[in-house]
UniProtKB/Swiss-Prot annotation:
Name this protein carries in UniProt: DNA-directed RNA polymerase subunit beta'
Cofactor-binding details, from the entry: Binds 1 Zn(2+) ion per subunit.
Molecular functions per Gene Ontology: DNA binding; DNA-directed RNA polymerase activity; zinc ion binding
CDD domains attached to this UniProt entry: RNAP_beta'_C
InterPro entries membership: DNA-dir_RpoC2_beta_pp, DNA-dir_RpoC_beta_prime, RNA_pol_Rpb1_3, RNA_pol_Rpb1_3_sf, RNA_pol_Rpb1_4, RNA_pol_Rpb1_5, Rpb1_funnel_sf
HAMAP family noted in UniProt: RNApol_bact_RpoC2
Protein role: DNA-dependent RNA polymerase catalyzes the transcription of DNA into RNA using the four ribonucleoside triphosphates as substrates.
Location of region: Disordered: 1-39
Composition-biased stretches (Low complexity): 14-24
Gene3D superfamilies (UniProt xref): 1.10.132.30, 1.10.150.390, 1.10.1790.20, 2.40.50.100, RNA polymerase Rpb1, domain 3
């Protein structure tokens, strides 16, 4: 049975299948004719066609067997022929050296014209890259030719050529050249890899090569993730598109136009929407004809220009697509079944090739525009432009001056001799390389014809021009620089015209900031002469100290102010914590130094602190200020509070233990009296006796406080209330309660203990704080004109009134500190702390505080390139005393080589910072044989004539002309393009490596700047591009108005009803229309990416003025849909991926199915609501019947993410993104989910409504079968119906003998057969195909009633399936 294929399967693949189908008659008996014999090379494409043909004619089983045999065949012959690759198979073509040589020559020429300032840096770069790209292409051709002619059976060549593995670009890298690589930013490196993998790469090339390779790997890794996410979004948006109807009956359709008279695969698998009539009037197909490849070919033969077909885009089935609009299911080339989940198939078809797309965004700096549409002259003659010709000067990206046509016209070349003139059609935007009336030779490039009206969009890019030699800048007058002030008020200079900027050679010296030139402009200088001098002076004066030299500079210190503490001895002692320095006064008081000698301190910092134990407490406690004690308010308590006025400080000791452990470790109770040394918590002991207070929170012990004192039980309510809370100070002799009094001052508090309430009398310690710190006289040092220096003592309290000090150990209550005071205007002045021996007793060290002024003096430098030689002289000696403003050192800048000094004019705000010496080698005197033809001040480049027949061999400016010689000042020209930013002014001096200008150039935005996956995503998510093009809102005629300052342009469109709309064009935008051109709605007025939302709006607004709302919406959406489908297809096609249109259409249908309600009219809709177009249509129809006001709406385009979140099913939306938001909204709005899609059903665990779970599936089976009795219901022991038989081909059997239900039955007799036939109305001619009956084991056996013709007949009618 395998060889009798099923229902003729139609193949969308190759032409062979088509031929086979066409050659066989339509109603052929199966496989009676032998298959046609084909003898040709079967490469990858042929193999595809062969398998497709086998599948179409012979079904799956036969095809898979054949494929297996083909595989074995391939392996067998490959083994016999021993096809393998060795190094010797990689044959490098002979032509390679030659091609590389030509490229090198071209590039040398380009570099030369750059050096001569004929082209700009940008044009050079573009030209170099284009040259290499072209060389690479030519090399590929050479490789192909080499293999084809010399070694067609080469393993590498066969492999790549047959499509088994690899492609031409890989072969190119193996035996051609690796070519240009991009750096990680996507810019092309203009150093190509000239070698291939066979020859091996040099080190440089290897590094550049790995650049590109790394990028490829990273790309692939990112691509898989991106592509997966894209697929997920697509599945989510289209998962509920299921084929639910047979025919929606719509009259709408889409038009598929032939491209170059061919349809390719674009019609295959679609159904026609109208009659298709050929050019001669013959009807080729009726409505709803399935188009298979042969029919598509017939359309092409009959020259049908466009076919209207049904499409998912226009299908009117509710919430789904119907079979007729969808067409073939491409898996088995027949009309799609009901219940097929076409949405998911579409999503996967678009998402799966995602991994094959590139992620690249290339910034090529002008893509190779090498030889597009170049027209050469065929004869010698004179060029004539037509009468209506309009051209404007244009400079090509390679720096060639040409003219660009502004209108379409004809160019003729009138022959100089006999012959027919050559006519060339010039289109708008084409480039002309000849002038009107110019005489030209044959085979000269005349023009480059622009491809159609594709004005490529351009973007602005910049490139720096870097100076190659030091010298003086001089502009060509042609540049016409102008000042431009931007919004921030910065002034920049811009070139207005194309021109050269010269740098005339010379030795440029950078002067230090405070140097002044000592030579005059134009003076002749000799080597070693002083050009400029800089001096360094002291600000305050003082004693000089010279330090050793460090590196290339030397420090001179000037002691401005010094102060020695004569009354103190300085003593250092070492401890384990480092060195501690003490100051000891004559009376024995000691201060601890806070800094160490040799360090620097600032004003207000603490120098030393008094060592004083009088104010140290035993434990923590409470601070109380007695009246009279006052402190300064301080911003931060870090350094304590300064005492304003002395007095008494009261201290109530208490011991605080911070614990922060579990409560179970507590060993005492709250309120208990404990003795000193009691363990309160494991391993923590009390230092004093007293009453314990325990603080706890959440079963964690926070603190334990021990308050010492004497405790008295007390029942007197009044007394207890008086001392409640914080407690009260009680002076000696004051009564406290009955029987309780005190001799000293106490602090009384009420406490609760396990024994009962009582009063705790806590001891109070008194500390007397003096008004001023008692310190020896420190004195101040005052300078008449320098900074002052002094020390002052201050007392600082560590705590403020009522502060509780939580501590177990004691604390310092009062600190006495020595602080530094500089009374000076310079806050940043630092003071050095030094230890100096006493002048009288050398063994005793004293503390000295000095203020130093430090000056760095540069050493002599032997000529470094930019400063020239410098020579520095110190004017002072060690220990010398100087006054303020005296010079300490002078630096002289010496001339390196003799010459003539020049310098720019000095102005008040701009002192001279550079000067230039014009050396002998910067000029060149050339003797001429005849009178020179140049004038002084003229600028010459290589090749220009100095005198008759004497070209110059260098660039420069003419300085002197004699009758027999010319003196040139050498220089280097740089071409700058219009609108470039000039970084230097005319006459400025520049060093080598300085930036001269920033070239602003336009580079073609190639369509693939955003290509591959990011572009697909951009389209499907309907992203709004950043700088989108300006679109025309209404059709009309264009008028272009230039603004007065040449900057802003306005495009006005005069519409049909004489209304005028103005479109102001921003700076830097190119206008894409010309004057008096007719434009339609949605047409581009400027270049740039299109905003699809805006486009839809333009279409809708325009149509709405002419058509009813519903039609306008549908037509606007249809236009946008067509555009989206084409754009997406273009991306995939550019990568060589073929996807059937219908898949993209299913997705686009989902993106454009909604409209936004603008005005609800009398309907129940809400303004701003997104709703399906169909629903609004139904609602508005109801309104027109009842006479209510219909709803107004505008169509919207939703990106796939937005569309997924806006589906009717909230379960599906919530499972996609923003779960909480979707569910909350659904709950608030009380939404119901009708479970129409697949996802919803999967999530709640039901059968999905597609395939066999499709609700219409059962009914469809029954409807096909017609009414019939169920045999089993009549007679359980009789024959059963087999699955693959149509119900009406079932045999009724006589009942089994009553005794045995499982008896083996005899074959039915003729009479039985006759009876069954008559009962079911089956004509007598037809035999039964098959029947089944239970045998002894009650298992069904299938038997054939042998009648081959009947079987084939049934199969032909499609009533029997393969099995």
């Amino acid at each position: 049975m395998t060889s009798t294929p099923s229902k003729s399967r139609k193949s969308s693949k190759g032409s062979k299948a088509a031929k086979a189908a066409a050659s066989a008659p339509e109603t052929r008996p199966l496989a009676k004719t032998p298959p046609p014999f084909r003898n040709r090379v079967v490469d990858k494409k042929g193999l595809k066609q062969l398998v497709a043909w086998a599948y179409k004619h012979h079904g799956t089983a036969a095809t898979s067997a054949m494929a297996d045999q083909l595989k074995d065949l391939g392996f067998r012959y490959a083994t016999q022929a021993a096809v393998s690759i060795s190094v010797n198979d990689l044959k490098v073509p002979e032509a390679k050296q030659n091609l590389l040589g030509q490229a090198e020559e071209l590039i040398t020429a380009t570099e030369e014209s750059y050096r001569l300032g004929v082209i700009t840096e940008v044009e050079r770069h573009t030209k170099v890259i284009d040259t290499w790209t072209e060389t690479n292409e030519r090399l590929v051709d050479a490789v192909k030719k080499n293999f084809n002619q010399n070694d067609p059976l080469n393993s590498v060549w066969m492999m790549a050529n047959s499509g088994a593995r690899g492609n031409m670009s890989q072969v190119r890298q193996l035996v051609g050249m690796r070519g240009l690589m991009a750096n990680p930013q996507g810019e092309i490196i203009d150093l190509p890899i000239r070698t291939n993998f066979r020859e091996g790469l040099t080190v440089t090339e290897y590094v550049i090569s790995s650049y590109g390779a790394r990028k490829g790997l990273v790309d692939t890794a990112l691509r898989t993730a991106d592509s997966g996410y894209l697929t997920r979004r697509l599945v989510d948006v289209a998962q509920d598109v299921i084929v639910r109807e047979d025919d929606c009956g719509t009259s709408r359709c889409i038009l598929v136009k032939a491209e170059d008279g061919k349809y390719g695969n674009r019609l295959v698998g679609r159904l026609t929407a109208d009659q298709v009539v050929g050019a001669d009037g013959e009807v080729l197909a009726e409505r709803n004809t399935e188009i298979d490849p042969p029919l598509s070919k017939r359309f092409e033969k009959a020259a049908v220009q466009a076919v209207s077909v049904r499409s998912p885009l226009t299908c009117e089935a509710n919430r789904s697509v119907c079979r007729k609009c969808y067409g073939w299911a491409l898996a088995h080339n027949e009309l799609v079944d009901l219940g097929e989940a076409v949405g998911i198939i579409a999503a996967q078809s678009i998402g799966e090739p995602g991994t094959q797309l590139t992620m690249r965004t290339f910034h090529t700096g002008g893509v190779s525009t090498a030889e597009t549409g170049v027209v050469r002259s065929k004869l010698e003659g004179t060029v004539e432009f037509g009468a209506k010709a309009r051209v404007r000067p244009y400079r090509t990206p390679h720096g060639v001056n040409a003219q660009q046509a502004e209108v379409d016209f004809n160019l003729t070349i009138q022959p100089s001799g006999k012959g027919k003139p050559q006519k060339i059609e010039i289109t708008n935007g084409s480039l002309l390389f000849v002038d009107n009336g110019q005489a030209i030779d044959a085979d000269v490039t005349v023009a480059q014809i622009a491809a159609g009206a594709v004005k490529k969009s351009v973007e602005k890019a910049t490139k720096d021009v870097i100076c190659d030699l030091a010298g003086q800048v001089s502009y060509d007058p042609s540049i016409q620089p102008r000042e431009v002030t931007d919004r921030q008020g910065n002034i920049t200079h811009k070139a207005q015209r194309l021109g050269r900027m010269w740098v005339l050679a010379g030795d440029v010296y950078n002067l230090p900031p405070n140097a002044r030139p000592v030579v005059t402009a134009g003076a002749t200088v000799t080597e070693g002469q002083v050009l400029a001098e800089a001096s360094q002076a002291s600000e305050y004066g003082g004693a000089i100290r010279l330090r050793e030299a460090l590196g290339d500079s030397r420090e001179v210190q000037i002691v401005t102010t010094a102060m020695t503490l004569r009354d103190f001895k300085l003593q250092g002692e070492s401890t384990h914590a480092g060195e501690i320095w003490n100051l000891e006064a004559k009376d024995g008081t000691r201060y601890r130094l806070n800094t160490i000698p040799g360090s620097k301190i600032g004003s207000g910092e603490v120098v030393a602190e008094l060592n004083d134990d009088r104010f140290r407490t035993q434990t923590g406690g409470l601070v109380r200020f007695a009246p009279g004690l006052a402190i300064k308010k301080a911003r931060s308590a870090k350094n304590g509070y300064e005492v304003n006025k002395g007095g008494t400080l009261l201290w109530i000791p208490q011991e605080t233990h911070e614990i922060n452990k579990d409560i179970s470790l507590l060993m005492i109770t709250d309120g208990q009296w404990i003795e000193a040394g009691t363990e309160v918590v494991k391993d923590i002991f009390s230092q004093t006796a007293g009453i314990v207070t325990v603080t706890q929170k959440n079963d964690i012990l926070r603190e334990i406080i021990v308050r010492s004192g004497s405790f008295h039980l007390c029942t007197e309510k009044k007394a207890l209330e008086r001392f409640q809370g914080d407690g009260v100070m009680v002076n000696p002799g004051e009564p406290i309660a009955k029987g309780i009094s005190t001799e000293t001052m106490v602090y009384v508090q009420t406490v609760e203990t396990p024994e009962g309430s009582g009063l705790l009398l806590r001891p109070v310690e008194e500390y007397t704080i003096p008004n001023e710190a008692q310190l020896p006289d420190l004195g101040h040092v005052k300078q008449p004109n320098g900074p002052h220096l002094g020390l002052k003592a201050s007392q600082r309290l560590a705590f403020k009134d009522n502060e509780l000090v939580k501590s177990v150990e004691g604390v310092e209550l009062l600190r006495t500190q020595l602080m530094l005071e500089t009374f000076d205007t310079t806050p940043q002045m630092t003071v050095d702390v030094e230890a100096v021996p006493d002048k009288r007793a050398k063994t005793i060290e004293r503390l000295q505080l000095v203020i130093l002024e430090s000056i760095l003096v540069r050493r002599d430098t032997i000529s470094d390139s930019s400063h020239g030689s410098t020579h520095t002289e110190l004017q002072v000696e060690d220990g010398q005393s100087i006054k303020a403003g005296e010079v300490i050192a002078t630096t002289q800048i010496l001339c390196k080589q003799e010459g003539v000094a020049q310098m720019p004019e000095a102005t008040a705000d701009e002192p001279v910072r550079r000067l230039i010496v014009e050396r002998p080698e910067d000029t060149l005197t050339i003797s001429t044989n005849s009178q020179p033809v140049v004038t002084v001040g003229q600028r010459i480049v290589d090749g220009e004539e100095l005198a008759a027949g004497q070209p110059s061999d260098c660039c420069g400016e003419v300085e002197k002309v004699d009758s027999t010689s010319v003196t040139l000042r050498l220089g280097r020209p740089y071409m700058v393009s219009p609108d470039s930013l000039l970084h230097v002014r005319d006459g400025d001096l520049v060093q080598r490596g300085d930036g001269l200008a920033l070239l602003v150039f336009e580079r073609q935005k190639t369509g693939d700047i955003v290509q591959g996956l990011p572009r697909i995503e951009e389209l499907l998510e309907a992203r709004r591009p950043r700088e989108s093009a300006i679109l025309c809102k209404k059709p009309g005629t264009v008028e272009i108005k230039q603004g007065e300052d040449d900057e802003n342009t306005t495009v006005t469109v005069i519409e049909a009803d004489d209304a005028v709309s103005e479109y102001p064009i921003l700076l830097g935008r190119n206008v894409m229309v010309s004057d008096s051109q007719q434009v339609t709605a949605g047409e581009l007025l400027t270049d740039g990416p299109i905003n699809p939302h805006e486009l839809l709006e333009c279409f809708f607004e325009d149509l709405r003025s002419r058509k009813p709302l519903m039609d306008a919406a549908q037509e606007a959406i249809a236009k946008l849909q067509h555009r989206l489908v084409t754009e997406v297809q273009n991306v995939y096609k550019s990568q060589g991926v073929s996807i059937d249109d219908k898949h993209i259409e299913v997705i686009v249908r989902q993106m454009t199915s909604k409209v936004r309600v603008e005005d609800a009219g009398d309907t129940t809709l809400l303004p701003g609501e997104l709703i399906e177009l169909r629903q609004v249509e139904d609602t508005n129809q109801a309104m027109s019947i009842t006479g209510g006001a219909p709803a107004e709406f505008t169509p919207v385009l939703l990106g796939i993410t937005k569309a997924s979140l806006n589906t009717d099913s909230f379960i599906s939306a919530a499972s996609f993104q923003e779960t909480t938001r979707v569910l909350t909204e659904a709950a608030i709005e009380g939404k119901s989910d009708w479970l129409r899609g697949l996802k919803e059903n999967v999530i709640i665990g039901r059968l999905i409504p597609a395939g066999t779970g499709f609700s219409g599936f059962e009914e469809e089976l029954k409807a096909e079968a017609g009414p019939h009795p169920d045999i089993l219901a009549e007679d359980p022991a009789g024959y059963r119906r087999m699955q693959n038989l149509r119900p009406d081909y079932t045999v009724d059997m006589p009942a089994a003998p009553a005794g045995d239900a499982t008896a083996v039955l005899d074959d039915p007799s003729d009479a039985d057969m006759e009876a069954t036939r008559s009962r079911h109305g089956i004509e007598a001619g037809s035999n039964f195909a098959a029947f089944a009956r239970p045998d002894a084991d009650n298992e069904l056996k299938e038997e054939q009633v042998v009648d081959a013709e009947a079987v084939e007949g049934l199969q032909e009618e499609g009533l029997l399936s393969d099995e």
